[in-house]
């Protein structure tokens, strides 16, 4: 075995050398095992050797889009025989399989320390995972006795870079740490929390020349550069099917962590590597601990992380269920785990940092909605964002993102500094938050081409950084504004500049629901698209409605964005916005301490409100104003506000709904589409529906009394006109008109027709059986087909226009909630006494009745046998038939007596038809009980009469 030397730097990973006897053959590729360190398999050819050596050109690493370096930077896999180099394991294996024919010979794997024999590298990997899980490196010696390749594995005496169990082995230049994301530097303790620094330029040290020169067949092995999900170091495998393991997702914030005292300036160094495009990556690995800049964390305010909590099953299950626990979940975990709540919060924060989880409050709420189908309000976690100037010089090149749970800290870019940062920290005095202190920080960046300082960030930037405002101060000392109110990362992305936000906020203060003209004006001023403007208004309204206290927006000096956590600037709920809008200056929107605070609720509700419960007086005033101008000016709105005692928002909402209704009605009139099966009755039904829509609007938003008086005043012709020719069309037909009411009642329609009904339109009086059949079909389908119409016409004997009209009236009544019988018929609760008789049986009974005019007792059994009906049903049918005949005779006698006594014709007609109409649309199922109820009667429409019906 060749000699092995330690690096002069104690923290450097030692170089491993594998001795190969002269019988060795081809080199084998680098393989990875999740439980052990990553090694190169020894070569199998005496003249070929392979090593995983650092590539000086790749020490900078592969740059990701967010500025972090790839986990594969620093080393390449090299075949010394071919001088072939590859940074990807799969690519290197492909080379070995194609170029070296003896590579595929299966060796036997032997662990000399445990006398363990394995036939394949997978078996040895499992053995290493079970018996050598704590070892950091292995030494492989390849022999070839009897032409059979044997790989002997031994554990070296010293492994200065051993990694604790459960930790991630990352690249040789990064920091190896425990799972603790926030820690204190414990000097003088050789325990898990001690940080080992691995020298970054170790592969390029000249001391490496002092290594013994490998003999023929010897090869040098260096650990590769991979991280693994389970946190363990990789081992050696010889399978050609292996792929690069996925990178670790637990890259916590690490480094020297000084405490940031309040009011004291400290300097922080940020080292940024130049970006290098990643090669051979199917996906971008997450940033490692080395590539993350170091961020200051006030450790005095954060409890010590307890590593023992990682094995708690309650905590792990809760985190896997949802990474952001609610208050109730924290209380439950406090009880079952016996850990304090603050310790639990720190643990959850650490786990989220490991997994790279950083969600906004909206994302947390949406995720809870999707997972639990509930809405749980969560308090947004304050964040700290650090950016240096070269990163924001290009809107799409924002690479650094550092977030930590620091309450009340904000980071900005002070003017005049090339790489400086401005960190603010709140000052607490007697429990009250005073004005903020600004702490300048310096950053060291790799030299880059100079870029001019910018004041804005492009609106189409797709970065994940919370707030960006480069080359200008993000904080001004203002006594009335707290530093915690300075930054609301949940509302503002880095999409809009100060000028854009000023224009948007100025418009939002005037009207939270901008019109189309205002949106177009904002798009011209800000350069944003219409969709972005509307989305900004929607998001802003959402936060005003859901946050504990609505946050007023005030632009401050030097382009800083200031958001007050207490609403000092009231939002006037104006309904109209002038066409020409002036963009206010930065000082015009600043709230002074003497500003009178409005008394409106701090969390206004922007949900739509129904206005049907308004008093008739209010509706009358609103209707009059709407008739004059559907878009009232400001003076009219003020007058309506004082007269109706309604709020500005309510008035604006009422006018908006009213305009929508008018537009809807106009659209319906323009379209005028009708079902094809209603062609014969389309004209009459269209007039009914059109009139119903006209009358329904005042019933909802206006005063019925005012509308009725207006309609009666316009009527020129009295509707009470009797055409004697139409008094008796059939023995079962008639028409009811009440002269006392002064309007003409349609038979099935509950609306008052304000026009004279044409004499040619005849309303048919329907029997209880006919209504029963119609209702049964209506429950089955509200829009019958042509076949349904033909069938119901055959069953009832009614003409098609009458059936079509009845269905139209019933649909309208159902829409307005006036069809009382619908639910009972839908449940199958039919009125007593109604028979469902087949057409053939009805003809038999009808013929018998026309012959005998009454039911003979001796013929009862014969009729029962022929019709398959019971005796009670046959008797009931004859009773109903005789009742109809009696009513018809009464109609004739009343008509004959009317002119003879000299009374008005209309009065006699009403007296004669009043009872005959009782059975038309009765809602009562007692045949002998007349009821004053109308099935399509609309209470919201103006009514001056009521139909009386009974079965």
From Swiss-Prot:
The gene is Zhx3. It comes from the Eukaryota. The keyword Heme does not apply. It comes from Mus musculus (Mouse). Residues 662-676 have a biased composition (Basic and acidic residues). Residues 677-690 have a biased composition (Acidic residues). Its main location: nucleus. Transmembrane segments: none annotated. Acts as a transcriptional repressor. Involved in the early stages of mesenchymal stem cell (MSC) osteogenic differentiation. Is a regulator of podocyte gene expression during primary glomerula disease. Binds to promoter DNA. Belongs to the ZHX family. This is Zinc fingers and homeoboxes protein 3. Residues 1-66, 227-252, 662-690, 916-951 are annotated as: Disordered. The keyword Ion transport does not apply. Residues 937-951 have a biased composition (Polar residues). GO terms for cellular component: cell cortex; nucleoplasm; nucleus. It is found in: Nucleus. Keywords: Differentiation, DNA-binding, Homeobox, Metal-binding, Nucleus, Phosphoprotein, Repeat, Repressor, Transcription, Transcription regulation, Zinc, Zinc-finger. Residues 299-497 are annotated as: Required for repressor activity. Residues 1-107, 492-550 are annotated as: Required for nuclear localization.
